[in-house]
Amino acid sequence: MASVLANLASWRLVLLFVAACHHAAPPQHAANVYRGYASWYGEAQMTASGERFNPHALTAAHRTLPLGTRVRVTNTRNGRSVIVRINDRGPYGKGRIIDLSEAAAKQLDMIDAGVAPVTLEVVR
């Protein structure tokens, strides 16, 4: 009986430790950080937000983020970043998570490559 109680006490300690680890909170922004590939587009058209596309504005297209969301895009090849406003829907190319305006792509130094690995962080 004493060994059963000792075993039970040991398991309680293990469960307490596991529970304490489980409740450790991840960084608050972890759910708002995405990794993938960015591309850019420059043709004139209407955007999903109803505004005319402006290749000189710091804007972008994303499939699911609410229109108006501001996102920090970082080119992981060179560390350059830019904050863009989501005003359109897309991209529709395989493996891409954001389509940038020409101005945003220039700031990330990805015009010639056309596609770059990026991280996205929602800033508001």
Report the location of each language-model feature:
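Short, low-complexity, charge-dense intrinsically disordered segments
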Residues: M1-L13
